[in-house]
Regions:
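Catalytic cores of the polymerase beta-like nucleotidyltransferase superfamily
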Residues: 1-147
């Protein structure tokens, strides 16, 4: 199976559009995880994740059923498919996790806010959020100090 090529500039532009569209629909939306780390270190992110106050059904309503995959909806995660060459963006609802029964998946999730979401993440660096429209970093866990 051939590799799917993704233009880094197109991927970044699409990740910004995802944030803009979620906000236009009345939801909080920020970049999260590795893309924030890479941006702060001056690197080109390999992919983009967005954390949002929108619930999975609301994310699907914003982007449409044909442009979304609900493979992680039980955990608040929807994949939004970009235009050709732009890749995809994982959009996760801010959440806190119940206990992990298998080491990988929580027994349940509770949708919450950005601060609570940052506290559940595995590394402080992954708890950083970035507003791509203003450049503002939201650091609830002192993750920037660990860069």
């Amino acid at each position: 199976m051939p590799a799917i090529s993704c233009d880094p500039a197109a991927a970044r532009a699409f990740a910004i559009v995802v944030v803009e569209r979620l906000r236009a629909a009345g939801h909080e939306a920020l970049w999260a995880g590795g893309c924030v780390r890479d941006e702060l270190l001056g690197r080109t992110p390999a992919d983009y994740d967005v954390a949002t106050s929108a619930r999975p059904d609301q994310v699907r309503a914003v982007f449409g059923q044909r442009r979304t995959l609900a493979v992680g909806a039980a955990f608040g995660v929807i994949t939004v498919l970009g235009p050709r060459g732009a890749g995809q963006v994982e959009v996760a609802t801010f959440r806190s996790d119940a206990a992990y029964t298998d080491g990988r998946h929580p027994a349940g999730v509770t949708f919450t806010d950005a601060r609570e979401d940052a506290l559940r993440r595995d590394f402080t660096i992954n708890g950083l959020f970035l507003d791509p429209l203003t450049g503002t970093v939201h650091d609830y866990v002192d993750g920037r100090a660990d860069l």
